[in-house]
Amino acid sequence: IVTQSYSTSFALATKMLAPSIRTDIYNIYGFVRLADEIVDTFHDYDKEQLFQKFEKDMEEAIVNKISLNPILNSFQHTYHKYDIPYHLVESFMKSMRMDLSKKNYETFDEYREYIYGSADVVGLMCLCVFVNGDKEKYEELKESAMALGSAFQKVNFLRELKADYEELNRTYFPNTNLMELDEESKKRIVNEIKADFAVGY
């Protein structure tokens, strides 16, 4: 329900997955989507407080292997089923926490750190499902999964460029003036994305 409500294209893409793993991908998507919604859209509430509660509930769900929150309960089930490394979850939550206060990414190191936590690790969580415990296959495909995560995230940055800047006062691309986005800057961003896709495929 969450996947279909928030991303029609992703919901359609998951129809190509085997039914045996489709629910687990939905479970991961539901978790990351809820975290993202808290930091990006709950403007009439104390987002910091909501995020802290969400993080605490997530940690308890993983430890106790159950949650009364259906999204977190579904996620912890997939987390344990595929032995998803906890450091992936930690990195994701760190990037989401950055969205609560950080508005500009001045250096490429900051930019890469955010993308790793907000996108690369999500690809790696999904990869855990796809390889179903095959550690050798996971290591073989790890770099490609991360590159695809980076590419799709940068495409999303471009798609949401105007909304992020005007509604959230947030910019992700370092050394880029959104008020004067010249052809050279656009070309650099597009070339970054092409390079990521080349590694991913």
Pin down the residues of each PLM region.
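Acidic catalytic motifs of isoprenoid enzymes
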Residues: 1-201
